[in-house]
Amino acid sequence: MIKSKYLVQQFSNKIKKIIFILFFLTLCSTVFADSKMDLGLEVYSNKAQCGVCHTLQAAGSFGDIGPNLDQMNFQMSQIIYAVTNGIGVMPAYEGILTSEEIEAVSFYVSEKSN
């Protein structure tokens, strides 16, 4: 009986640790996503000035040269490719933006566009 109680207590402690770790990881991922969104908006609005050509209501941009991003449904990988290599009249940002900035602006656009 004592051994059984001990095993239950050990199991309970392990479950508590797992719950704590999951909570911590969830909190970290939320903070990471928020900072990535902030960097993405900064790159979109200021460094790359995407809003000069593109409409994206969430960013307060209403450019009419490139596609209206509010009406697009791109995969993040497609956005990364376009930002990195350019497409049509859109310039390539490889060498202008860091890979972190390219990923952040792509994440931002993929999350904020419809």
Where do the language-model regions lie?
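Extracytoplasmic copper-binding redox domains, predominantly the cupredoxin/blue-copper superfamily
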Residues: 2, 32, 62-63, 67, ...
